[in-house]
Amino acid sequence: MRGGPCGGYPRRMTAIPDSTVGTNTAVAGLESTFADELGALTVPWQGAHAPDPTLLVLNEQLAASLRLDVQTLRSEDGVGVLSGSTAPAGAKPVAMAYAGHQFGGYAPLLGDGRALLLGELTSSDGQRVDLHLKGSGPTPFSRGGDGFAVIGPMLREYLVSEAMYALGIPTTRALSVVATGQNVHRYGAEPGAVLARVAASHLRVGTFEYAVRQGEVLQPLADYAIARHYPELTELPPGRDGNRYLSFFEAVVEAQASLVAKWMLTGFVHGVMNTDNTTISGETIDYGPCAFLDAFDPAAVFSSIDHGGRYAFGNQPVVLKWNLARLAETLLTLFDSTPDDAITAVSAVLATFDERYDGHYAAGMAAKLGLAGELVDRALVDDLLTLLEEHGADWTGTFRALADELRGHSTPLDGLVPREHIGPWLERWRGDLTKHGRGAAETADAMDCVNPLYIPRNHQLDAALRAATDGRLAPFEKLLEVVTHPFDRRDEWSDYTTPAPPSFSKSFQTFCGT
């Protein structure tokens, strides 16, 4: 979240510094189409000076895909840009304005309280992406916060977003984390840091919630979003019959239904599914209070501020649909000539969310169970989930153990669910597997390709971030290596498959630190 706690209202600063043109060429090729075309949704701004910036981690593979020179990024000029101290030559850094529903309550103005959009780059595959800094200092949207961030949460977002990318889940990505050399007061004094984030864009449901109340900017915003994310829709009529904008809404519904299904299949708990954290692109964004399931529990909540369990693991599809309804409300004036027709049209599209989600989830679960290409028996899935919940079985470990079961190795599964309880279910599952005629070994190998062995286990990530805060990066670097190879079994990584001990899980909480 931006600017202090995860909620609250912003206050405007009284002065806005000039957006000066720098001479630093460490990040070349930045464009500013969002700021140029939608200036009403931005405030020109500069990052705060970092007194002693030190590069902690650099995503060299991502840098190369953005056609950025790695050695230049590691130079003094490069670190200056990545820390927010120096604006790249020709850049027009801005803080982005948006609103949002936070835990169901509407906040009319949120915005980048500790972040800056430096501009856009074109990747080697021709995709336009944002380069965004997080923790770069106060902005007009800081809401009384200091605008800074600390090492632990920035490294957390770096590692988890890269793990999600390796898992094949749409996500923003991390280019770097730079320590600023300045302490920030959170739970005592902690070392400050800035994350450089790369995203398909930073357009959110909350961006539209803000724009709809700003007069003429809504339609240009919708057209920009379509051109950027769903260009196949640009040829549709833009008139008030709603073809283009209704199709745009449908595309976002589809993208988000697919995304949340992937979360549910992976055991990912986002933790703060506010509308300002729901992207138009369908990417996962904001990893502040996120976590991963160990024991399967639909009611699992890890966020310290989610007292009512609104964003519990099992609630995520319902919440996502609710967020999409808020997007629909902002687009009504673009759909049809009468309010009733507009509501009817958008409601019909929103009503398809459940079927879309169910389809993505069923296909994903079929693959996890080795039934890819087959219609999965809903009762088979539901009964497995009941068994896992009743016995507190590890979500990630269960599906790898099922593959081992097909190979004749029963010990892993026996350690998760007693044989006398899961035995009848296994017979039904094996019966379904025989229908597609694939051998047991081949099926097990296929399952291993979609069921990760390594995820960012909560206790291991927590330990790595504590060590990094104390100046020891080695545990973080090792965990990063492991979770970015989630399907590759290596004997030396066996410790990384172990769920957290019950004593840890009982008290573990996440915080909205990013």
From Swiss-Prot:
InterPro entries: SelO. The keyword Electron transport does not apply. Pfam families: SelO. It comes from the Bacteria. The active site is at D276. Keywords: ATP-binding, Magnesium, Manganese, Metal-binding, Nucleotide-binding, Nucleotidyltransferase, Transferase. ATP binds at G111, G113, R114, K134, D146, G147, R197, R204, D286. Its cofactor is Mg(2+); Mn(2+). Nucleotidyltransferase involved in the post-translational modification of proteins. It can catalyze the addition of adenosine monophosphate (AMP) or uridine monophosphate (UMP) to a protein, resulting in modifications known as AMPylation and UMPylation. This is Protein nucleotidyltransferase YdiU. It comes from Rhodococcus jostii (strain RHA1).
